[in-house]
């Protein structure tokens, strides 16, 4: 009899363990169901809020016109044109070997450099940028540009670059001294991982809608190893003290807010207060102090050339 009781106790013990494991599995699956859709919905914010700035274009980015920034800064690529506003007087370039301007205010980039263009009342600082195609991607004046017009090669796999990691650590330490908590929510993603993310969005929302808030594989800045998403990837982050501090101080450590508010039609993406890109201190300060996007600073476009064929 004692042997039978021991066997029953063992069976009861096994049943209890099995029941506990089953409960844990159900709980884990429930958490997964709650967490994964939430992450998808917040990866680029609410997709219904995005502008369709990334709709396909047929003209090459280098041939498209740029418009002058309200701060009196204008960047244009070599061999491309940009448009200044109507002038009361005639336009003049301080260095026609760098940039030329006609009577209508159309600026043509001649060669890499800087000059001033004025109508006698308003001065514009003109930067003519040089594009260089390297194996991994495209550089404008030595800055790696990745957006809807300029992809990276699929095999480019730098990981989170040390200069980015070190700069963010300094930024995070400085924020901590102010009682704030800034940490890495997401950083480097390789091409294959971006395929999964983009396909998930396409399955949920369709490719046209996905293009308005998610980068296609090869077109994601996260593949550069120069980009970090801070804290939670959620619109609510923009209302936090950390987000305010980040916008005010990120340039001191070489970062810019990559997709600033109100510039959706230029960057192709909704405002992302958590998304920062390392460009170096001097460049970051110039961009942030003038309220520019990286596209405006480099004189490039951000538009897909056609539908996704992946």
Specify the residue positions occupied by each region the protein language model found.
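Short, exposed beta-strand/loop patches in secreted or surface proteins that constitute
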Residues: 98-101, 108, 136-137
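Solvent-exposed, conformationally flexible loop/turn segments
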Residues: 77-80
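Extracellular/luminal low-complexity segments enriched in Ser/Thr/Pro
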Residues: 105-115
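Well-ordered beta-strand positions in beta-sheet-rich domains
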Residues: 73, 98, 106, 123-125
């Amino acid at each position: 009899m004692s042997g039978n009781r021991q066997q029953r106790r063992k069976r009861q013990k096994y049943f209890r363990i099995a029941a506990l494991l089953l409960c844990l599995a159900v709980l884990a699956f429930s958490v997964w169901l709650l967490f994964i859709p939430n992450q998808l919905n917040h990866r680029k914010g609410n997709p219904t809020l995005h502008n369709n700035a990334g709709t396909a274009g047929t003209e090459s980015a280098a041939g498209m016109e740029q418009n002058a920034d309200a701060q009196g800064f204008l960047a244009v690529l070599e061999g491309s044109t940009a448009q200044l506003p109507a002038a009361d007087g005639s336009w003049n370039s301080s260095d026609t070997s760098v940039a030329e301007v006609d009577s209508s205010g159309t600026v043509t980039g001649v060669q890499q450099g800087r000059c001033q263009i004025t109508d006698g009342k308003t001065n514009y600082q003109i930067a003519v940028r040089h594009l260089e195609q390297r194996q991994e991607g495209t550089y404008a004046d030595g800055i790696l540009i990745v957006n809807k017009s300029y992809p990276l090669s699929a095999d480019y796999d730098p990981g989170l670059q040390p200069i980015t990691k070190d700069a963010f650590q300094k930024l995070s330490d400085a924020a901590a001294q102010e009682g704030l908590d800034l940490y890495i929510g997401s950083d480097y993603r390789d091409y294959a991982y971006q395929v999964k993310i983009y396909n998930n969005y396409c399955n949920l929302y369709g490719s046209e809608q996905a293009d308005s808030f998610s980068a296609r594989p090869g077109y994601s800045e996260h593949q550069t190893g120069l980009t970090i998403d801070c804290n939670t990837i959620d619109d609510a982050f923009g209302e936090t003290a950390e987000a305010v501090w980040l916008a005010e101080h990120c340039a001191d450590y070489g970062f810019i807010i990559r997709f600033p508010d109100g510039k959706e039609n230029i960057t192709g993406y909704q405002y992302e207060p958590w998304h920062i890109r390392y460009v170096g201190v001097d460049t970051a300060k110039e961009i942030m102090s003038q309220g520019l996007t990286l596209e405006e600073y480099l004189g490039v476009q951000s538009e897909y050339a056609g539908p996704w064929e992946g």
